[in-house]
Structures are given as C-alpha cells and as structure tokens.
Amino acid sequence: MIKLGIRVANSINSGRGHFERCFSVSNYFTSKIFWFLDEKNSFYENRIKDKDEIIYEEEVTEVSSMAKAVSENKINIILLDSYNIDINSISKLFKNIPLCVFRDTSKFLNVQMVICPHPISLDNNKNIVSLSGPKFAPISSKYINNQLCKKNKNINLLISMGAYDSLGITLNIIKSIKKLTKKVEKKIIT
C-alpha cells in the first residue's frame, strides 16, 4: 500500500504553484496522505482533505518531521516540490524509500522519478524515471476540458509563468503573439 508523504513549499515567497501541482496529484490517491508544509495558512489547510494529516516543518529548508514519519513507517514514498530544499542531500537521507520530485530545470538529480512540466530534456541516467513536457503537468480536469471562448472575434489567452519571471519569458511570449496577430487582448497580471 502506498503511504504518500508530500513535502511542498507553501510559504508566501513560494507562490501557490507548488501546492497546486501537489494538490492535483493528491486527488488520485484514496489513502491518507501526510502533508509537510512550510507554514500555517488556512487557504491550504481548507483545501487538504479531512482524511489527510498536515504537519508543519520548522523552516522552509527543513525535513525533520518528514524524516520522523519515514522512521515510524508512516510514509513509504515522498513527493517533493520545493526550491528551498537541497534535493541531493534529501536523496541521501531518504535512500531507502522512493523519492519523486517536481523540477523546472534540467539539472541532474539522484532520485527515482523526476516530473518536469516543461518541454525540456532532463539530464538523468537511465535508472531514473523522467517525465518531461506539458502532458505531465498535473492540471485539474476542470481546466483541461474548457471550451475556447471567443469574444467579438478576439481570442483571449491567459499566460501564466508563475510568481517569478526573472528571464522575462512572459514578455517574450506576448511579443511573439503580437507578431502573429493584432487581435490579441493583452493583460499582464502579476
């Protein structure tokens, strides 16, 4: 039986994307899930199912509560989605159970599975399961099945690059779209 522990960044500085990815995955599990969060926040607490257990780590870089749960056999697989935690040191700490991570870079990780929702090639060895590309983005089905909505013959697009766009990717996308057509309504919401 899978006993899943999810260590996810939910601090104010991390944005909601990490939690949303893990929450989408959690909907596929009927068994109890142990959630290891950075800090208390009623928004996240209210979304996590009653059958699940929420445990708060002391710091955003901390995993001691999760390590305790592993030693007590409460969890036997870890899903990790946080930029604040050094994944390679985590993989050494939890070498006896599978470790699956969400990643947004192609950097090599010594884990059992890497999920990257971006269309990049991952630098992993053949012993690591690598799932890369938009089809592996855990998106809720309520968003996937939406119909294209046209207003006044204009096509409305939502471009979301997460909380931080230090490389200016959003503006590059908008510039590319502007070249394709003049019928695009542009709104940047941060």
Predicted regions and their residues:
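Active-site and donor-binding regions of nucleotide-sugar-utilizing enzymes
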Residues: I6-F29, D38-S130
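Short internal beta-strands
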Residues: K32-K40, K186-T190
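Extreme N-terminal starter segment of soluble prokaryotic enzymes
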Residues: M1-G5
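Short, flexible, glycine/charge-rich loop motifs used to bind or transfer phosphoryl groups or to couple energy/partner
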Residues: K68-A69, R103-S106, N145-K150, I177
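A nucleotide-sugar donor-handling region in carbohydrate enzymes
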Residues: N110-L167
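Donor-nucleotide binding loops and adjacent catalytic segments primarily
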Residues: N152-T190
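A short, Lys/Arg-enriched amphipathic alpha-helix followed by its capping loop at the start of a domain
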Residues: V25-K32, S176-T181
